[in-house]
Each structure stands twice: as structure tokens, then as C-alpha cells.
Amino acid sequence: MKNKRKICVVITARPSYSRVKTALLAIKNHPQLELQLVIAGSALLGRYGNAIEFIEKDGFEVTEKVYMVLEGENRTAMAKTTGLGVIELANVFYNLKPDAVITIADRFETIATSIAATYQNIPLVHIQGGEVTGNIDEKVRHANTKLADIHLVASENAKERVIKLGENPDFVINTGCPSIDIAKEVNDKPELNFDPIKKYGGVGSEINWKNEYLVVMQHPVTTEYEEAKEDVLKTLKAIAELNIPTFWFWPNVDAGADGTSSGIRSFRELHNPKNIRFLKIWSH
């Protein structure tokens, strides 16, 4: 079919992919839509799980890759990464000429997506606006809301909050979180049960995950990023003392991530906790 509408989805971090995987499939399979998939930010980096490998294994064709993350894991690096993202994504959108751009949640990379699209008069769709999380992420989420034209929110409370920000109620739609589709699929299909250690590897102890276990992911607090290492060491000590099998995931790329990562490595090397398995990514 000619004149398909081009929908550009920008994935900038590992959690964003699983959150919208079923939406990507729906766009890809729709006869009147063309999926333009842009992978950017930490989704391209091995130290943060290299999510692009899982995306391509799932059969998605990547339209563009945008390398935009600066080293440093501090507030200045976050600001510069955002600026670089605006520059690079502006070129991507200029060349692809999408009919709409989809951005997700509250990462600082997402505000770069929103700015680059909005200033080129490309309709912007924002997923999961209106949520309250605190920190800089909440400010970015609400800024994305004000730049967006269509809002796909995950709850009635979020919908009400977006409308109170002044957005047209006709364009605020409670779709729920699309990642629930993945949870339902796993629940409905026993064949999707797998050994996560065998599939994703990781380092640390061979924990017994077939009974009760914990899942831990601790990100740095960007307003207190200097304390990231101390914070994560406290959590690690507490989890080790619980002696419950635990999957521990690597932090994101926010300011303080270097301290969090350093704390994880040093604790693992010094104590080798018998109940913790450390993983970079877990993607269905």
C-alpha cells in the first residue's frame, strides 16, 4: 500500500524496549503504517546491556542508530548528552520525515527526542506521562507532556494529572502500560518459562530461582549522586544478610551510575554473596 504513515519510535534505554515491544509489533504489522525504529543512548552500549541485540533478534529492523551518551556519569554529562541527542535526532528526523514520533516515559534522553521532533513540527506521542516519581525524571516527564500532542497514559490518575497540566482531554488516552502485554503473554504461554541464568548469564552465585526470589535494581539519586556508592553498599549488605536468592540488575546511565557500579563490583569481589546473581539485562 502506498502512502503509509511513517511512525518513528525512539528507544533510548533497555527498559523502553520491553515496555513497547507489543506496540512495535502492532505498528510493524499494520497495513497502513511503516515502522521507523531509532535506537539511541544507553540501548546501544554494552555496559548497559546492549539492548539492540535483543531488538534485532526479535526481528525488528533498526532504521537508525544514534550514539549520544557522554562518559562521566555526572550531571554535566547528562546535560551534554541531552544536547548532543537533540542535535543528532534532529538530523535523523529531518532525513526520515516521520508522520509522528513516539517517545517513552521520563529519561533525559527522551526530552532530546521531544525537542528535536517538536521544533520540526512533527506530531509527538508520549507514552506514560502524568506519573509521579520524584527527582529530575519527574520534571522531564512533565516537560515531555507539555511538548507532546498525544498522550498515552497508564492509569486514570496519570490521565487526570496530564489534563490538569492543560492538555486537551480528547488527546489523553488511558491505554495502560503496554508492558502488561508481555506479562500476560508469559503467563499464558508456559513455553516462555526459561532458565534466566542460562539465557542471560551474569556473574555471581548459581542461585536457586525456582522458589521465591528477589529482583533488585537500584539507580543513583541524581540530586545526591555523590552518595551513590555508599547508598548501594547499604542495600547490598542488607540483601546479603537476608540470604534470599536475588537477581540484581545493573544501574542506568544517570549521574552517579559510576559510583553505583563501583559499589556493586567492590562488594561482589570482597564478599562474593552466595545469594546474589548480577545481570546487565533481562528482556523477554
Description of each model-found segment:
Residues 61-62, 75-91, 194-205:
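Glycine-rich, highly charged phosphate/nucleotide-binding loops
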Residues 9-11, 37-39, 126, 174, ...:
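Structural beta-sheet core signal
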Residues 6, 10-13, 17-28, 68-171:
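Active-site and donor-binding regions of nucleotide-sugar-utilizing enzymes
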Residues 55, 191-284:
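Donor-nucleotide binding loops and adjacent catalytic segments primarily
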Residues 34-78, 88:
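Conserved nucleotide-sugar phosphate-binding/catalytic loop shared by glycosyltransferases and other
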Residues 43-46, 148-228:
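A nucleotide-sugar donor-handling region in carbohydrate enzymes
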Residues 30-36, 243-246:
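A generic structural motif
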Residues 12-13, 39-42, 129, 177, ...:
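Cofactor-binding loop segments of dinucleotide-utilizing enzymes, especially the Rossmann-like FAD-
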